[in-house]
């Protein structure tokens, strides 16, 4: 029987992926950071030997972009070393590894969508640590699928959508950056894309390599926040927020630099796995329906 070893199973992506895997009838051995600390090499090797999975999916990551600037060692321990340990363990049991990465491996200096072969140039520690993790996986295990994603949000965990909803319930006016452009990605859509890759890996005909995945469409954080509040109000949410003002990144100083342009070309993953990618507006609506309705689509 095929079994997936899933790390980060209680994170915002891992939670949705675990549920979808179970719904699909796919056997899964879920691990949280508490039940498997991926920074410990021997622990990872033992867990993988014990489980003998068909595929490993790594959703575990250090994702606090600003805090990474002062917690560099921890960010690299999780995002580089943890990824390396999982790749080594996967190779030892002849299991492919699917690993989630980020738009932060790029500097955002382009003005056209990023393809997988574009030059990487992270602006901060978080992006550096994630890129280092990618490089370790490529070095240690040819049977890998690396999926970079951007602006991830979901019903679980901490993310931009839930932060905007919280602030909009507390304040009458908000200020949101408008000069950073990208594509929001709903965790449930990314989880569905990962399952496409899992099925190919289980069959033994997975086209290994690096892929880009985000929802269709392009927006700014400012316009995204407008849509969040508008959709939530349309669903009956009693938000106090009446106005959202656009501001420059320079008006909102943060410890870590953000890429100003994080738009992906998704042609490779769409064609390779024959998948349909929903528009971010439709996915935002679906996520808010779940958040307010308490059900999963």
What would you call each of these model-derived segments?
Residues 22-46:
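Adenosine-cofactor binding site in Rossmann-like domains, unifying the SAM/SAH pocket
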Residues 155, 180-191, 211-231, 286:
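Substrate-binding strand-loop-helix patch
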Residues 77, 82-85, 105-147, 151-152:
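Catalytic helix-loop patch of NAD(P)-dependent Rossmann-fold dehydrogenases
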Residues 279-297:
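Amphipathic terminal alpha-helices
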Residues 135-196:
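NAD(P)-dependent short-chain dehydrogenase/reductase
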Residues 3-21:
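N-terminal Rossmann NAD(P)H-binding glycine-rich loop of SDR-like oxidoreductase domains
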Residues 200-253:
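Mid/C-terminal beta-alpha module of Rossmann-like enzyme folds, strongest
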Residues 41-80, 89:
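NAD(P)H-binding glycine-rich loop region in Rossmannoid oxidoreductase-like domains
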């Amino acid at each position: 029987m095929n079994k997936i070893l899933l790390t980060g199973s209680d994170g915002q992506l891992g939670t949705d992926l675990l549920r979808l895997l179970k719904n699909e009838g796919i056997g899964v051995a879920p691990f949280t950071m508490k039940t498997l600390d991926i920074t410990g090499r021997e622990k990872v090797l033992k867990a993988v030997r014990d489980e003998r999975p068909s595929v490993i999916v790594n959703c575990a990551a250090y994702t606090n972009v600003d805090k990474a600037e002062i917690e560099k060692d921890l960010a690299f321990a999780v995002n580089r070393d943890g990824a390396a340990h999982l790749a080594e363990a996967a190779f030892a049991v002849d299991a492919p590894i699917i690993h989630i990465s980020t738009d932060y491996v790029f500097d955002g200096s382009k003005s056209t969508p990023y393809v997988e072969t574009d030059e990487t140039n992270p602006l901060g520690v978080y992006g550096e640590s994630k890129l280092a993790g990618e490089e370790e996986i490529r070095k240690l295990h040819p049977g890998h699928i690396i999926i970079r994603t951007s602006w991830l949000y979901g019903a679980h965990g901490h993310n931009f959508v839930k932060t905007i909803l919280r602030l909009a319930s507390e304040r009458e006016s908000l200020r949101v950056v408008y000069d950073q452009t990208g594509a929001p990605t709903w965790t449930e859509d990314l989880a569905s894309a990962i399952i496409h890759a899992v099925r190919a890996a289980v069959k033994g005909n997975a086209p290994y390599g690096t892929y880009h995945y985000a929802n269709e469409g392009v927006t700014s954080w400012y316009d995204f926040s407008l849509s969040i509040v508008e959709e939530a109000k349309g669903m009956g949410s009693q938000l106090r927020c009446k106005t959202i003002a656009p501001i420059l990144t320079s008006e909102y100083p943060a410890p870590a630099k953000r890429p100003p342009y994080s738009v992906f070309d998704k042609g490779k993953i769409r064609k390779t796995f024959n998948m349909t990618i929903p528009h971010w507006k439709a996915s935002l609506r679906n996520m808010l329906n779940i958040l307010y309705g308490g059900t999963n689509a």
